[in-house]
Curated annotation (Swiss-Prot):
Job of this protein: Probably involved in the metabolism of xenobiotics and of natural substrates. Hydrolyzes medium-chain monoalkyl phthalate esters.
PTM description: Exists in two forms, E1 and E2. E2 is probably produced by modification of E1.
Protein name: Monoalkyl phthalate esterase
Catalytic temperature dependence: Optimum temperature is 40 degrees Celsius with monobutyl phthalate as substrate.
Annotated organism of origin: Micrococcus sp
pH-activity note: Optimum pH is 7.5 with monobutyl phthalate as substrate. Retains 50% of maximum activity between pH 6.5 and pH 7.8.
Enzyme Commission no: 3.1.1.-
Keywords: Hydrolase
Top-level taxonomic group: Bacteria
Length: 20
């Protein structure tokens, strides 16, 4: 589902930003 893909992308992006 597009929603799941979007959520996963956002989660990965958040994690990446957290790592810096």
């Amino acid at each position: 589902s597009a929603t799941a893909a979007r959520e996963e992308y956002q989660r990965k992006r958040s994690q990446f930003i957290e790592i810096g």
